[in-house]
Amino acid sequence: MIFLYAALGGFFGGFLRWSLAQLFPGKRATLAANTLACLAGGFFVSLDLPHLYTVLLIAGFCGALSTWSTLAKELGQLLNEKKWWPMLGYLSLTFTLGYSAVFLGMRL
């Protein structure tokens, strides 16, 4: 049963992730997806939900929406191109927005 909840949440999170990639070019989609996943995750954590809903919303939806592997690929490309400052800026912005979004989400 848990698998079905995770899969259902993952379907919707993955669809939203794909939709963001259609709306925003490149790194903007990754930044938007990760920030939105952090905001939603912070909000869902604050609700003290039953375990199955936590699996559905946090592990499934937020897990599929966030895209840390794409972030690693994008940071790796900047690193290989020796674009140190853009890499550090992108990494800093991602973590700053992510942590801020979790903080905000927990207070909504």
From Swiss-Prot:
Activity modulation: Na(+) is not transported, but it plays an essential structural role and its presence is essential for fluoride channel function.
Segments crossing the lipid bilayer: 1-21, 39-59, 84-104
Gene: fluC2
Keyword flag Methyltransferase: no
Biological classification of the source: Bacteria, Bacillati, Actinomycetota, Actinomycetes, Mycobacteriales
PANTHER family the UniProt entry points to: FLUORIDE EXPORT PROTEIN 1-RELATED
Membrane topology of the entry: Multi-pass membrane protein
Signal peptide residue numbers: none
One Pfam family cited in the UniProt record for this chain: CRCB
Keywords for this protein: Cell membrane, Ion channel, Ion transport, Membrane, Metal-binding, Sodium, Transmembrane, Transmembrane helix, Transport
Annotated binding of Na(+), by residue: 63, 66
Function: Fluoride-specific ion channel. Important for reducing fluoride concentration in the cell, thus reducing its toxicity.
Catalytic activity: fluoride(in) = fluoride(out)
Any GO BP annotation: cellular detoxification of fluoride
Subcellular location as annotated: Cell membrane
Protein name per its UniProtKB record: Fluoride-specific ion channel FluC 2
Family classification: Belongs to the fluoride channel Fluc/FEX (TC 1.A.43) family.
Top-rank taxon, per record: Bacteria
GO cellular component terms listed in the entry, alphabetical order: plasma membrane
Gene Ontology molecular function terms on file: fluoride channel activity; metal ion binding
